[in-house]
Amino acid sequence: MAVGRSGARRLRYGAVRDYLLESWHADHEGKLVKSGGPTIKNVSGYDLCRLLVGSLGTLGFLAEVTIRSLPVPPCSRWMTGVCDPFELQSRLYRPSCILWNGNEVWVLLEGHPADVEREANLTGLTDCSGPPVLPSVGRLSLRPKLLRELPKMYKQGWLAEIGVGLVHLPEPIKYDQSSLSAMTVMSDIKARLDPTGRLNPGREVF
């Protein structure tokens, strides 16, 4: 939760913060603070617990969380090959994940066996054991429609989550002016929730 990683299945299931219902966290004074509620309908006011997701401990230390869960799909199938990932996404009903490195595509299909088999026949891809290892040095968020331009923007080594807009890079990214504006907002939130600067000192909030 503190890292905010949603995993490869975000295309189908959404972000991890969307499953957080309630949390207890320690604030900058060491006091336990409750936010959210055990059910969605019980939540009122500012949804502080979701703000803590992905904050890396800079806004508070998560101590306990209540999350919404989903049943494990009866069938999961990874496939890979060379094709247009955007055309592939338009053909499939609800793929759990589509990864693309500018050449190869990896897709995860989940659900009832008959449905997965039917979807697999539409892909023209071959079965594989799983996806490649995601580069973990840099992470970039783009509008999904801009992912087509990635081969022009970066050399080899990146991996994009089609339909989500996340790009995993083998090198750190440089912040542009729009990112600096967002950092100003996050710095203000940091100052309000951690005026003493005790929470994960030295860690950037953005």
Briefly describe each language-model feature range.
Residues L70-P74, A114, L147:
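Generic "edge-of-domain/loop-turn" microfeature
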Residues L62, S69, D115-E117, L199:
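Hydrophobic positions within alpha-helical membrane elements
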Residues K31, G102, L122-F206:
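Conserved glycine-rich FAD pyrophosphate-binding loop
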Residues L108-C128:
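Terminal amphipathic helices with adjacent charged low-complexity linkers/tails
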Residues M1-S96, E104-W106:
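FAD-binding subdomain of flavoenzyme oxidoreductases
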Residues W78-I98, E117-A120, R139-G157:
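Short amphipathic alpha-helix segments
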Residues T66, W100-N103, E110-H112, R143-K145:
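Histidine- and/or cysteine-centered catalytic micro-motif in compact active-site loops
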